[in-house]
């Protein structure tokens, strides 16, 4: 349950659906109903945000962002497959859009998509960034990553943790990699690495979510494979990341080998 950030009831329903078993109806407690409603609201909001970001990317307002992705070698098919998007330059653009869809300030604050500030004014977490929706195993958007297109800092910005999203218990691209026919999973460093490798045919590629690789992520990989290939950069940071990840993988019963490489251009 913790891996997927779902309630006990949702976990039972998922298992029953896979097994083709019909569960008897049970009256939910008030707390369970409240938690379930909050999850549904957040999923709906994330979906609306992802659709809006993707729309902006394909609009005139997203011309620069789309050119950036095309210059990185991504095809239209790949951009659509991963649902990539663009957060506009206006600081409250998404806030105004979500308000028009009926979401409250409190709900937006809980989503991590908007910062609610009665003094400075409400403003979006992501603006003027390329957007990478992060999905769970059921293809539902649970969070976002955003990358600047220039030299701004931080280069990458991720959603904070919510009732749906735990960075240390999810892996970017695993929703696709779990379907791969390969016996091994490739672990690389970031969003663009995953997307580029998938486009090249390595659909068994995943990446951590802006944090160091964790034992929980190793346990998650163990559910889908027994072998992991680390494909990190050959710079100091990449080597250190590989050296940290290797023992974690092996301690969790995974065969792990490291392959460092020189990157044609930075990510």
Summary of predicted features, one role per range:
Residues 205, 256-258:
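Generic structural signal for residues in well-ordered beta-strands
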